[in-house]
């Protein structure tokens, strides 16, 4: 087949191909704000505006893109959610660098919604178990003496908070946060903070007196985890962590069932 015939053949086939494609995927019209957002994002990524530099004013952006103020504001709000700009009242938007926290916060709404689905909490608890299992194994193998000292300090604060549930929850979160800090990966930190926030927010309300025993059990389990890390035994640390998180999960599931019965 010569070049001309090959081209003609493709031309004959292309309407059918396009037709099938269009039936599968309807065309979607973009909003003006989305087009402004995409163009500004590309300008930022091309470094036409550097980090810390202010973008043009809303009025200037309206004139540049030939759109109204609502489209400009929607575009800037979308860029803020992506972590590409910071917006303070009375000031022009300023270019910023996306952080790990920004990435995770974008998922927060979807995560909280997923937690309300049947089995949602169990799925997130499993995610936490897999994640922290790797953290304690890493800590047992690589934690410095200074990092182990921070874990020990967090454990001491844990022990001092046993009779105050609000304080204990904060000290519990802090203990696990120190574990998440050990690898030195900011994405790990952001994921860990978000996971705990999402799971704690999904927990039922429980009378203080019923939490005291749970607090003491958690503290004793924290001790076993830290001892295994001090001994540089990743398998033991992993087992201790899994025992701890499975215990926490079972306790809160029991609290949840009891809470439902008393309604």
From Swiss-Prot:
Single Gene Ontology BP annotation: negative regulation of DNA-templated transcription
Domain HTH gntR-type per the UniProt entry, residue ranges: 30-98
Alphabetical keyword list: DNA-binding, Repressor, Transcription, Transcription regulation
Gene3D superfamilies per UniProt: GntR ligand-binding domain-like (1.20.120.530), Winged helix-like DNA-binding domain superfamily/Winged helix DNA-binding domain (1.10.10.10)
Record-annotated DNA-binding residue ranges: 58-77
MF annotations from Gene Ontology: DNA binding; DNA-binding transcription factor activity
Primary role: Transcriptional repressor that controls expression of the genes required for the catabolism of sialic acids.
Family: Belongs to the NanR family.
Protein known as: HTH-type transcriptional repressor NanR
Organism: Salmonella arizonae (strain ATCC BAA-731 / CDC346-86 / RSK2980)
Organism lineage: Bacteria, Pseudomonadati, Pseudomonadota, Gammaproteobacteria, Enterobacterales
